[in-house]
């Protein structure tokens, strides 16, 4: 009975380990973008975060959530094949916001080995 239980545990562990080796994995070129200093006369700025699926299975972005309504992410919902690149476009709209330094986060959730990654945008908006 002990041998059977031990063999079953080893089989489950082995299958779990093998499945983990065939996961998707997201790798971003950069995780922070600095818009620098800009005037509140021109409050809308955009950037693109580029990533690669360095895993062995298709990468699916399940959800992207920004920390503020002033930050709008957009992305292609199709799976990214292993070795392929994808992008996440982020628009910051500082209209009606107080001048000064800001730092916003964008949380990316995937089916990858690391399920959650945080991206950041920051800058300084000057007043009139």
Task: Please tell me what each predicted stretch does.
Residues 88-96:
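Short, hydrophobic beta-strand segments
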Residues 45-47, 86, 102, 117:
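Hydrophobic core residues within well-ordered beta-strands of beta-rich domains
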Residues 54-57, 96, 112:
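Short, acidic/polar linear motifs in exposed loop/turn regions
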Residues 47-53, 90, 104-109:
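Buried hydrophobic-core signal for structured, non-transmembrane domains
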Residues 56-87:
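Surface-exposed binding patches on compact interaction domains or structured appendages
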Residues 21-48, 54, 125-128:
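Beta-sheet-dominated interaction scaffolds and their linkers
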Residues 1-24:
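Bacterial Sec-dependent N-terminal signal peptides
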Residues 98-127:
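Terminal connector regions
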């Amino acid at each position: 009975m002990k041998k059977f239980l031990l063999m079953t545990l080893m089989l489950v562990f082995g299958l779990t380990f093998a499945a983990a080796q065939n996961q998707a994995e997201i790798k971003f070129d950069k995780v922070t973008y600095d818009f620098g200093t800009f005037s509140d006369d021109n409050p809308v700025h955009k950037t693109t975060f580029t990533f690669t699926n360095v895993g062995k299975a298709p990468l699916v972005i399940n959800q992207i959530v920004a920390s503020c309504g002033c930050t709008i992410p957009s992305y292609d919902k199709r799976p990214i094949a292993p070795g392929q690149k994808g992008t996440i476009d982020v628009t910051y709209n500082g209209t009606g916001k107080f001048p000064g330094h800001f730092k916003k986060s964008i949380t990316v959730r995937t089916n990858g080995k690391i399920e959650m990654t945080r991206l950041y945008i920051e800058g300084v908006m000057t007043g009139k």
